Amino acid sequence: MEKPLFPLVPLHWFGFGYTALVVSGGIVGYVKTGSVPSLAAGLLFGSLAGLGAYQLYQDPRNVWGFLAATSVTFVGVMGMRSYYYGKFMPVGLIAGASLLMAAKVGVRMLMTSD
């Protein structure tokens, strides 16, 4: 029996969950502190991640899109902010989720490279 190329849970579902986490983080940041940059960044990066997840849904081999770029960018940005502030919540949570998403997308890139 041949091993399936893709796992039981498709990557785009993780992408949609990641999108929801990023957007909700921007909204919560705005509601709690009134930070318009937090809202703008959450909506912008969440939209880009959502677009990447949608592209992945349309073509499972298309992992080089917005989802990869957004998660890798957020690992760097939120990781630096978490280190600077010395707190895990909320930026460390987003950095950790972004790291996991970047790792999952990276593994998929290695699996689909021809």
From Swiss-Prot:
GO terms for cellular component: mitochondrial membrane. The keyword RNA-binding does not apply. GO terms for molecular function: identical protein binding. It is found in: Membrane. Keywords: Developmental protein, Membrane, Neurogenesis, Transmembrane, Transmembrane helix. Its main location: membrane. Belongs to the TMEM14 family. This is Transmembrane protein 14B. It comes from Homo sapiens (Human). The gene is TMEM14B.
